[in-house]
């Protein structure tokens, strides 16, 4: 089980509608060490909009999700530890996300495919977006992450602005519900195990 990552390499067509001046704010930038520091903590999967049928089905069954990014700067990677509640069951997964610094993308290999997403940092450093298949009308999508379980009105407004720039609308958005999270006990168990390992080392 994994958070929505592209099932194939992202199209290299323009990311968002460049003809709209308001959309100039939503563009990829090179990923720096400061970016990795900003990403290196706990995030909540807050909302998404996908046209790809497989992604759409996946997020519709995702009740709640959160994850941790830990940067390994010298290797240009992020350690991903994710907790997902789907169909009233908690799933845990850990993997490595590779950072393509110059083109502002993140990628993950699942053993079969290399999956790529564009990273969009927002005005609020407590939120960011991943954009998938931007140039493919029937597959494009966007996922929205915040550093708290519930997004602020300002964070949501920026998400909606980016969604419009991608050529999608609010009716396509699927929201998660933190009250349905079942992974918090497992997260606490993992925290205790890490503390014990650290104390013994």
Curated annotation (Swiss-Prot):
Organism name: Oryctolagus cuniculus
Main location: secreted
Protein name: Alpha-1-acid glycoprotein
Family from the record: Belongs to the calycin superfamily. Lipocalin family.
GO biological process per UniProt: acute-phase response; regulation of immune system process
Localization of this protein: Secreted
Pfam families (alphabetical): Lipocalin
Cystine crosslinks: 90-183
